[in-house]
Amino acid sequence: MSQSSIIVVGGGLAGLMATIKAAESGMAVKLFSIVPVKRSHSVCAQGGINGAVNTKGEGDSPWEHFDDTVYGGDFLANQPPVKAMCEAAPSIIHLLDRMGVMFNRTPEGLLDFRRFGGTQHHRTAYAGATTGQQLLYALDEQVRRYEVAGLVTKYEGWEFLGAVLDDDRTCRGIVAQNLTNMQIESFRSDAVIMATGGPGIIFGKSTNSMINTGSAASIVYQQGAYYANGEFIQIHPTAIPGDDKLRLMSESARGEGGRVWTYKDGKPWYFLEEKYPAYGNLVPRDIATREIFDVCVNQKLGINGENMVYLDLSHKDPKELDIKLGGIIEIYEKFMGDDPRKLPMKIFPAVHYSMGGLWVDYDQMTNIPGLFAAGECDYSMHGGNRLGANSLLSAIYGGMVAGPNAVKYVNGLESSAEDMSSSLFDAHVKKEEEKWADIMSMDGTENAYVLHKELGEWMTANVTVVRHNDKLLKTDDKIQELMERFKKININDTTKWSNQGAMFTRQFSNMLQLARVITLGAYNRNESRGAHYKPDYPERNDDEWLKTTMAKHVSPYEAPEFEYQDVDVSLITPRKRDYSKKKVAK
């Protein structure tokens, strides 16, 4: 048998951790990224990473962390993998510490932990307000050790175009495009790990990087992978409104004592503290977002009648703010011109994260043999709503599980991708070259960026904080209209190298497919759970909807087929969420 290898698509935390774990066992890894890996969206994460290390003597434990996570996710997550993640969390934090991550420390020299939403405990390890950057850089240093050893090869500036599937629908490699010279090539591999992040750009403006189109996940969904719980999109309660994008103001601002308020009857009204005395400003994100939305949109009590409320840190010690929140204070000063140490920040909710993603089993493998997924592009850990600072944990943990399981899968194969006929790979390349030629020759009257703006406006208006069935159906009609208009796009720039417009057009067609999964998944789910809220169905309905949504692609112009899979609630019995009272110890 020839030399086996694994391909990892995506260079964020999940992709880098999967690469490290696979290379650790001596497996050759090709790492593909659409941007230099240090620019992956993980670099934008601010607040921290959760783990019940319990240095504060609060009686915290991995079980408490597990309970907070499934409770915060409104019981839609399968419990065994979540429990395993929470049990691994303290050792992941210590591993990162040993890798040299500059975590903040207490005066005694212990790791410091801050409080985040949906918990009563201080369990979030952090490196100022740039935790994602510090973790990403530390993991990249480890990957570079394996690069030097000849085990890892990086392909930065390559876009994933599809998995190579053989006659048995088993994954045997990928097709990718070099974004400098636009050459399309195939790469053989015995397993592929998708770590391509979320689809925030489907909503137009979001807190996500412009590369987070969901295009790669959409491609493998169109190739037959199930897409699970797509309708669960997290809207972060605190972001700076902007004309181009929405800039995240981390939950750590509230974790360090920031207060959310607006004026009511001429006096400051701390509405979260009033309604949820036990958790105050640190209720889970879906709840904080709905309250801010209600205050601004329904009660018309936003600042000066605009859709904004205050996030106030001005009562805190400025020196402490610089040490613990320097990253976000700098961002706010740069883009708003005000000093958050002296004046309250103005914020409003923004599309932030997808709890849904590619369906995976407990080994992080999709329903396509040999195709794994980890990080935000898989659905497995967060149920109906993610707790703050669980994303960095789930990305790293997902990579830690996917890497070794991909190696195990490869070692159990009878035939290697290297033994496959080259005609299989040539056929996949030819198909992608034809698609690219079709895009480059588009000569209609529509503009892909205008169509994308329309999609974003419709999705943000109707498929975010509050959802109504009639509006969801109209949104689906709009997506189908955009699919028709897509055929009439004009590619004015036919440059043969580094062609951004044509690239975006191709990604946009994939975004439209996922937009239907999100919209119709939301339409079908007649209940309110986590981030999915329907005023016409205000209660959670476990009898009918304690189920994972699984979308299956039919054809480009047909609606997806939906199946539903029971959630594994074997460890903690579902109970109603109530954040106005403290959690009763179990």
Swiss-Prot record:
It comes from Bacillus subtilis (strain 168). Pathway: Carbohydrate metabolism; tricarboxylic acid cycle; fumarate from succinate (bacterial route): step 1/1. NCBIfam families: PRK08641.1, sdhA_Bsu. This is Succinate dehydrogenase flavoprotein subunit. Substrate binds at H236, S250, H352, R386. The modification Tele-8alpha-FAD histidine is found at H41. One of its GO terms (molecular function) is flavin adenine dinucleotide binding. One of its GO terms (biological process) is anaerobic respiration. It is a peripheral membrane protein. FAD binds at residues 10-15, 33-48, 376, 391-392.
